[in-house]
């Protein structure tokens, strides 16, 4: 393969978008031009967190000059352990994205572990209301087994549903507005560990607490 230099597609115009832009990916999505990069050393401003991020730029592409004039920049994922995503086209035209579920700022695996981090579940990308909308690829549904359904279940205090268990779940919960202040679902719970998903009704806050999630 012989490569020829053509132009600088895009660059940080004012020095506010980190230092090196890693793993760039440029493509057209629903008639919008998108540039995905993973800039290092971003400052915590607006929707960006401190350190390494994954972001996407939206704007206009000059095909003659081969220059991308970005107009808007958004965070691609709010988690710290999502980095260097890349996309591909499925045979049916869907834009699919896979990321590295790790970050250079995260702790490297312990010496006695035989694996280090993993890749994310592939996501389908679409444009909705001027932003990228992400959903798990529809092929995930082929892995669903042993469906359990509870309807009109009234919960008071602690409640454990014996039929719902396991380390891998795809769960949909519909909560009817009622007289409650806080609603919590504890995942992967045993004597030592649990991960809590909490809805605070009064403050309209949603919290994922991984304090006791373990490694």
Task: Give residue spans per PLM region.
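Beta-propeller and closely related beta-sheet repeat lectin domains
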Residues: 22-25, 83-86
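Short consensus segments that form the blades of beta-propeller domains
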Residues: 16-17, 45-51, 113-116
